[in-house]
């Protein structure tokens, strides 16, 4: 089914890298309004807060994506004290970080009118956080079951409720 989604909005987790940019574009090409959120902490993207308007304009001009910057430093620092799923390479709390960021994005959904969430995750691309079992844990522990669409690998995953409801075509 091709979705007629002029009224549908997706909230995408956006790193600014290729995968999240492609995920946003794939969804937008279906006529779905995409709002992207780039979470920042002192460990990633913090310098962007000094030139927030410039960054937002640049992403809109180069990728056609509307992006919001959101500083989650206090909550992220709390997560670092004891990540439930441990640390990955280079002291990264990969799985816990994804759970946290998706949980934060889910809280933002009403604010932007989003019906579902989007990420640029690809099965097997990252050894700790993008294994099939890890993707399920992340979705479950972030309470994003059914609303988390991973368009770059959707055909390799079970359909989400958003897909079953016809909000997005896999």
Task: Enumerate the language-model features and the residues they cover.
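ATP-dependent adenylation/nucleotidyltransferase module used to activate substrates
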Residues: 1-170
